[in-house]
């Protein structure tokens, strides 16, 4: 996981707003403590031939230890400590973001998926159809280019592009700075489109109300079992490209069953960013969440 491997080096590039700016009066600390790239070289040539007569001879499980991962030269205890330090700092910044969103009565969603699942196409349709009902802003995360933010802006909705460079996910500091560059979204919606990656974004709280995992019918039914942390961390699974399900012989019931093995409480909606099928149900879900996050509703829930 990138909490210890150092893929995020604090050198994200965040666009300046396009004719929009609002001053939140907050200072942000954007560095990641202890993020370094490690290159583990071996001076010896190893020529080992192992004959295993074990039932699991075909499986090398590097996650079968207290740290949940294996890194050359680091003990499980050290991995756990480094991860705690990095995530602890991020969690403090995420709490700051969450407080700001609450003060602005902004409902923030963190959209996560593997590359090519259709997050951006989904967002383009959604913001186009919701922009007359809500103030909307979008934060786009990619390693390079502003292509996705430009697609959002073409709808008339403001978007800030965050290029993470070598980083494989957004973090709370990046989101806080990008939010500063959006127009004021008082009482509106903030969509955060994370970098396409079903691993690292699961660990990083951005201050969002919830994570929405976008999954497409082209990915196969077992993705929730292969990447359980992301599905466990998400409140809603949007199954995109449902218009292709019959062509692909996609088993919807099996996919939902796999997702609920990992997260029994996950909600599931099917839709097609291409045809618009299922978007009415998605908008109803958003409006229900909006109603639940009004100041009166939040006070009653405490």
Curated annotation (Swiss-Prot):
Belongs to the SIMIBI class G3E GTPase family. HypB/HupM subfamily. The keyword Nucleotide-binding applies. Residues 18-61 are annotated as: Disordered. One of its GO terms (molecular function) is GTP binding. Residues 108-269 are annotated as: G-domain. Involved in the maturation of [NiFe] hydrogenases. Required for nickel insertion into the metal center of the hydrogenase. Exhibits a low intrinsic GTPase activity, which is essential for nickel insertion. Ni(2+) 1 binds at residues 2, 5, 7. This is Hydrogenase maturation factor HypB. Zn(2+) binds at residues 168-169, 200. The gene is hypB. Signal peptide: none annotated.
């Amino acid at each position: 996981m990138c909490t210890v491997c150092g893929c995020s080096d604090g050198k994200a590039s965040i666009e300046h707003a396009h004719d929009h700016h609002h001053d939140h009066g907050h200072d942000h600390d954007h560095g990641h403590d202890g993020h370094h790239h490690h290159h583990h070289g071996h001076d010896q040539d190893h020529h080992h031939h192992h004959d295993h007569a074990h039932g699991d001879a075909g499986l090398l499980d590097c996650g079968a230890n207290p740290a949940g991962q294996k890194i050359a030269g680091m003990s499980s205890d050290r991995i756990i400590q480094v991860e705690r330090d990095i995530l602890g700092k991020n969690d403090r910044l995420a709490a700051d973001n969450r407080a700001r969103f609450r003060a602005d009565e902004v409902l923030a969603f963190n959209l996560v998926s593997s590359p090519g699942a259709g997050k951006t196409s989904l967002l383009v349709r959604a913001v186009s159809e919701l922009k007359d009902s809500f103030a909307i802003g979008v934060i786009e995360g990619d390693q390079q280019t502003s292509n996705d933010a430009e697609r959002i802006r073409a709808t008339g909705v403001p978007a800030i592009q965050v290029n993470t460079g070598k980083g494989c996910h957004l973090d709370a500091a990046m989101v806080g700075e990008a939010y500063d560059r959006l127009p004021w979204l008082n009482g509106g919606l903030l969509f955060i489109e994370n970098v396409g990656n079903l691993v690292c974004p699961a660990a990083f709280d951005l201050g969002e109300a919830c994570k929405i995992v976008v999954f497409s019918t082209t990915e196969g039914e077992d993705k929730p079992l292969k990447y359980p942390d992301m599905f466990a961390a998400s409140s809603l699974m949007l199954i995109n490209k449902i218009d292709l399900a019959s062509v692909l012989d996609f088993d919807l019931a099996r996919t939902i069953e796999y997702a609920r093995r990992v997260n029994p409480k996950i909600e599931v909606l099917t839709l097609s960013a291409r045809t618009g099928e299922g978007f009415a149900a998605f908008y109803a879900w958003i409006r229900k969440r909006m109603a639940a996050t009004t100041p009166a509703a939040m006070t009653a829930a405490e």
